[in-house]
Amino acid sequence: MVAALSSLAAALGAGLHPKTLLLGAVAFLFFAYFLKTRRPKNYPPGPWRLPFLGNLFTLDMEKSHLQLQQFVKKYGNLFCLDLAGKSIVIVTGLPLIKEVLVHMDQNFINRPVPPIRERSFKKNGLIMSSGQLWKEQRRFALMTLRNFGLGKKSLEERIQEEARHLTEAMEKEGGQPFDAHFKINNAVSNIICSITFGERFEYHDGQFQELLKLFDEVMYLEASMLCQLYNIFPWIMKFLPGAHQTLFSNWKKLELFVSRMLENHKKDWNPAETRDFIDAYLKEMSKYPGSATSSFNEENLICSTLDLFLAGTETTSDMRWGLLFMALYPEIQEKVHAEIDSVIGQWQQPSMASRESLPYTNAVIHEVQRMGNILPLNVPREVTVDTTLAGYHLPKGTVVLTNLTALHKDPEEWATPDTFNPEHFLENGQFKKKEAFIPFSIGKRACLGEQLAKSELFIFFTSLMQKFTFKPPSDEKLTLNFRMGITLSPVKHRICAIPRA
């Protein structure tokens, strides 16, 4: 590198022709790029890459998780991609995924924070934080969620109450076609609101609807091409208009909403009475007054609250897939109806206690999650120290994605991997848990809201199946086409909720 710089300087001093200088500069840039991005010895294989751009424009961002499966066939269960100089390794197959997420988890425990996320959140919050900050915030969030009823009857009763509001909202549609997206989102988000803010919102509340609309937009925008380009070229993209600027604006509005809720809590905060997550966080902050080193501050409170809402959107996507699959597979929906009718009837409120007695319904919910595949490549990890995985060398800082798409469609794990088949989770008529089913991830960084999400999914889904038959509109053909965002969700569609006699 020093020799190349010396040669360029000598050329400049010799007064060479401008074209010669330009060619020399280009050659130097290519040489510098090669040195910077050349793959280390014994690095995982991968497809051919373009200079500077890598594999960026060979991937279809809308279907990248499907395109990657072709690379698995060609390069094996461990391969790499280059996105404009950023190396990413894709890990496929249950044994290797368990190595990364469980057995060698300390080597892969961190999250890479992309520029698009760092611009709004820095490295704060629950989802993308790392190190001591992440440990403190996750430990506190888990403890607080448990204190507010996670796994207890009190939180289950909140979910049951919200399920009643959801069924009433759908009854008002009178069996006519409607988009269930925001009704489901209302219900799921109200559970998070009750935990974080200590209150729920009416479905027609204008402020609440604006909040949900902003969240829906950021879910989609963050995966858009312009936002991905911002992750690669932030120093250029920050000056250009586009979806990334809308994303930043939306996050700012969401931060202001949480800030207003925080200010309202401060006005009547009583440390002896903890009403919700914000109160609990304020109490924790009071233990470190004026501390510059504590991770418990207002900035982290706002980011953690937004992360809780963001995690809740996964349940919304699962529920939307669930109703869509029921409308497309009426014979399976009939079996769900029959089981619910025979076990709890049409009037008893579904509860988690009835889950064991409803194995087919439980299997259907799990199959919805498998086929819905809402986190196709899981949440990224980052290598914390130079590591050897399956004989390959992964340098510190390498970004790692675990291929849940391949795992949940693996023909060695599933009898009919590409077909919606609840029998995958049944054995002799009883529900059977599958090791290869990990929609919430596994290990220390598994989804902290897993238990809450499972309760919501079961109670909401069973309550709706108890009251309605879901059918396609007569003038609309339903499909399993998806919309790529932070999660994979169905494309916009309408559905009919026919009240059951």
Curated annotation (Swiss-Prot):
* Superkingdom of origin: Eukaryota
Supply the enzyme class, top level: oxidoreductase
Q: Which UniProt keywords apply?
A: Endoplasmic reticulum, Heme, Iron, Membrane, Metal-binding, Microsome, Monooxygenase, Oxidoreductase
Q: Which reaction does it catalyse?
A: an organic molecule + reduced [NADPH--hemoprotein reductase] + O2 = an alcohol + oxidized [NADPH--hemoprotein reductase] + H2O + H(+)
GO MF annotations, alphabetized: heme binding; iron ion binding; oxidoreductase activity, acting on paired donors, with incorporation or reduction of molecular oxygen, reduced flavin or flavoprotein as one donor, and incorporation of one atom of oxygen
Q: Where in the cell is it found?
A: Endoplasmic reticulum membrane; Microsome membrane
The entry's note on the tissues where this protein occurs is: Small intestine.
What EC identifiers does the entry list? 1.14.14.1
Binding, heme: 447
Keyword presence, Cytoplasm: no
One annotated GO biological process: xenobiotic metabolic process
Database matches in Gene3D superfamilies: Cytochrome P450
What is the protein's major site of localization?
Answer: endoplasmic reticulum
What kind of membrane protein is this, topologically?
Answer: Peripheral membrane protein
Protein known as: Cytochrome P450 2J1
